[in-house]
């Protein structure tokens, strides 16, 4: 029996022992070494050749990932680790570090219970380090820390023991400060990483060695010994004495939770159903015999197997040939295969019980974020996955040959299922389709995959920026009349209070129609007026619809229509047909016809939409543009060039500091001005500068630019160049 066959047999056995399972993600800022780390863990487990680890890119299975040298999708593998005489099943997900692919990180965090956060010893904590930590902690995922590239501090920067310790300590302090500020209230202290306890490891993924305090105690090795070995060129000996796989996976087993521990506190946060119900107790008690409850976190298309879905099983057992129900899309599917991932391979195990990360095929129509259950026991949906970033750049695509239009539409629908952070708008009449993504690289990868993987020739437009609409002022009360003039609604709008808006962006407040009184307390704690807080009907697009009327007959009967109209109006605002956000609408009065026939959808929907549009156009409407944080590191002599380039892009400097001969600069720049930035900054720094970016959010577009950009957007969309005034909607 080969080593691989023995491992598969052991995995099949350990799958049924939740206390011996660890579901973990590896996440980091781009180029901090997490895929090299993943490869070496796979090599240590015998899944790829040790000689190729770090070059094999065992977790980067797509051609474009290997060509670019970055991880674009999340990749999975299961392996076995022995710790203190017991064997453990480690289900591992490697995630992207590039800001454009943060959606994969968020979805991966829903599938795992623990995360190995990788930080480069030279760069320290970087923008995406904070973002991936935020994504993990928001999903109640416990972190441990691996400080990578320690050999560079010794070999390149020539740090001695004291300087080395100072640099490593500063990284740990910074990571713990982030954990303390971002972790759930009851986990802030418990989840901070601790060197003495062994939840921090140091090493070199590339050179394949690592050490933490437990390993130091076992081997009597010190940092001085490590410095000596590096200086003497004996790092090959280090990997024998301090094997990376052993140190890292032992840390994972000891400090990250098993599913039967994690699901007790995670399930109530990510599932809206009744915890005391049979399904709820199946998840809390980890019963493989109870009702099936799972969530699909990723969808990919394989040319042989069709749709391959990654699914975390929270309750029951996923079985081959069983019929399952897709709760979100209200459809049934028959499972063709069910099993586990081993890097680029899948192993069909026939069954996958609670607590594991599974793959399944046969689920046509499934998309990431879908809840699955048994067809004969339908459950409540899991909470939607909140993505930290949102689409900010759009391209228009058309089929080169008109006859390929139906195929293009089908491919685009598939793309949006595989990656929910991609937003697709399909216009079957004109043949033009819009794809919106997280950035230039995100869209380049998606369009290249359509051309290369789907074998479809397409024409791709220049990138277009995604704007949003809002208001700067407070409108008067506006009357909206139904077409038959028998129904009238009185509405005004103003900007939503900043604490509420920020809480919606951060995910601290949930969107949706308000069903419970408890939600009002959350609004009040953020400074909202008590009476208004109790009367919020709907939260949508980071905006609120508040009913402040009293004793209006028949209002409850048209409530759903009013909210439908409110949501529809915000999808396409009146200024430029872009999404409207950050608004607070007050319904202060209404007059309704006594006969239900005269207050149906054809009357109520246009009345409320017109009132909303007129109120927005009466409240100093504005456009919001997406802003990126840009971090540049370059030799001091290039600092002036960097500042000049950023200022030419309407950017502003936020901070800068000097580290030896290197300047580190923080800027904020409109994404509209970031095209071609990589090449320009290379020229400005003589090829010696590095930069990284992070989405900051949306800010008000300077007023002197607004009219021109509104005209451009409206013309591109086939609308009249000038927006209508409020009187157009009040007529």
Curated annotation (Swiss-Prot):
InterPro entries cross-referenced by the UniProt entry: EFG_II, EFG_III/V, EFG_V, EFG_V-like, EFTu-like_2, G_TR_CS, P-loop_NTPase, Ribosomal_Su5_D2-typ_SF
Chain positions recorded as GTP binding sites: 28-35, 94-98, 148-151
GO MF, one annotated term: translation elongation factor activity
Keyword GTP-binding: yes
Domain of life (superkingdom): Archaea
Gene3D superfamilies in alphabetical order: 3.30.230.10, 3.30.70.240, Elongation Factor G (Translational Gtpase), domain 3, P-loop containing nucleotide triphosphate hydrolases, Translation factors
One protein family per Pfam: GTP_EFTU
Record-listed Diphthamide modification sites: 598
The name this protein goes by in its record: Elongation factor 2
Organism: Methanobrevibacter ruminantium (strain ATCC 35063 / DSM 1093 / JCM 13430 / OCM 146 / M1)
Organism taxonomic ancestry: Archaea, Methanobacteriati, Methanobacteriota, Methanomada group, Methanobacteria
């Amino acid at each position: 029996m080969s080593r691989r066959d023995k491992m598969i047999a052991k995995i099949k056995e350990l799958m049924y022992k939740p206390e011996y399972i660890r579901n973990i993600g590896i996440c980091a800022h781009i180029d901090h070494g997490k895929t090299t780390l993943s490869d070496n863990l796979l090599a240590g487990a015998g899944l790829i050749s040790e000689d190729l680890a770090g070059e094999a890119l065992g977790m980067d299975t797509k051609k474009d990932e290997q060509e670019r040298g970055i991880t674009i999708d999340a990749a999975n593998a299961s392996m076995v680790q022995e710790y203190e005489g017991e064997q453990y099943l480690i289900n591992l997900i490697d995630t992207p570090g590039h800001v454009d692919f943060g959606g994969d990180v968020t979805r991966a965090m829903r599938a795992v219970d623990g995360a190995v956060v990788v930080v480069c010893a030279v760069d320290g904590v970087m923008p995406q380090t904070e973002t991936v930590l935020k994504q993990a902690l928001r999903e109640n995922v416990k972190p441990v820390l691996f400080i990578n590239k320690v050999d560079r501090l010794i070999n390149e920067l020539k740090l001695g023991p004291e300087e080395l310790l100072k640099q490593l300590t500063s990284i740990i302090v910074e990571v713990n400060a982030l954990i303390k500020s971002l972790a759930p209230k009851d986990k802030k202290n418990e989840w901070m990483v601790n060197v003495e306890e062994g939840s921090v490891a140091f090493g070199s993924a590339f050179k394949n060695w690592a050490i933490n305090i437990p390993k130091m105690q076992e081997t009597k090795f010190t940092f001085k010994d490590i410095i000596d070995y590096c200086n003497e060129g004996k790092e090959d000996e280090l990997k024998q004495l301090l094997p990376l796989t052993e140190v890292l996976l032992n840390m994972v087993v000891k400090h990250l939770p098993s599913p039967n521990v994690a699901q007790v506190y995670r399930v109530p946060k990510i599932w809206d159903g009744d915890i005391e119900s049979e399904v709820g107790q199946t998840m809390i008690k980890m019963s493989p015999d109870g009702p099936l409850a799972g969530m699909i976190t990723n969808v990919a298309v394989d040319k042989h197997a069709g749709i391959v879905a990654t699914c975390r099983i929270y309750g029951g057992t996923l079985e081959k040939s069983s019929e399952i129900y897709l709760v979100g899309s209200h459809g049934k599917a028959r499972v063709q295969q069910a099993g586990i991932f081993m890097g680029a391979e899948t192993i069909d195990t026939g069954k996958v019980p609670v607590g594991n990360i599974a793959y399944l095929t046969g689920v046509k129509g499934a998309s990431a974020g879908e809840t699955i259950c048994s067809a004969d026991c339908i459950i409540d949906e899991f909470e939607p996955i909140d993505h930290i970033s949102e689409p900010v750049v759009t391209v228009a695509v058309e089929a080169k040959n008109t006859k390929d239009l139906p195929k293009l539409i089908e491919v685009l629908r598939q793309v949006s299922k595989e990656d929910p952070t991609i937003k697709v708008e399909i216009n079957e009449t004109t043949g033009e389709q819009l794809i919106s993504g997280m950035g230039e690289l995100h869209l380049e990868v998606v369009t290249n995959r359509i051309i290369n993987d789907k074998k479809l020739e397409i024409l791709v437009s220049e990138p277009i920026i995604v704007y949003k609409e809002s208001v700067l002022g407070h409108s008067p009360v506006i009357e909206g009349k139904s077409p038959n003039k028998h129904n009238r609604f009185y509405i005004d709008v103003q900007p939503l209070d900043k604490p509420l808006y920020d809480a919606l962006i951060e995910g601290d407040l949930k969107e949706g129609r308000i069903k419970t009184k408890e939600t009002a307390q959350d609004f009040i704690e953020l400074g909202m007026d008590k009476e208004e807080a109790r009367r919020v009907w709907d939260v949508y697009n980071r905006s609120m619809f508040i009913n402040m009327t009293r004793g209006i007959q028949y209002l409850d009967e048209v409530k759903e229509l009013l909210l439908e109209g409110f949501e529809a109006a915000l999808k396409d605002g009146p200024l430029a047909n872009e999404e409207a956000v950050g608004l607070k609408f007050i319904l202060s009065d209404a007059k309704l016809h006594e006969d239900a026939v005269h207050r149906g959808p054809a009357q109520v929907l246009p009345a409320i939409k017109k009132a909303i549009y007129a109120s927005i156009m009466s409240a100093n409407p504005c456009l919001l543009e997406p802003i990126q944080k840009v971090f540049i590191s370059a030799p001091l002599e290039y600092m002036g060039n960097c500042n000049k380039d950023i200022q030419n892009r309407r950017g502003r400097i936020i901070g800068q500091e000097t580290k030896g001969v290197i300047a580190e600069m923080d800027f904020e720049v409109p994404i509209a001005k970031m095209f071609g930035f990589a090449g320009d900054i290379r020229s400005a720094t003589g090829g010696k500068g590095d930069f990284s970016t992070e989405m900051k959010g949306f800010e008000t577009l300077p007023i002197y630019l607004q009219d021109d950009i509104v005209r451009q957007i409206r013309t591109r969309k086939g609308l009249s160049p000038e927006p209508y005034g409020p009187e157009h909607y009040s007529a």
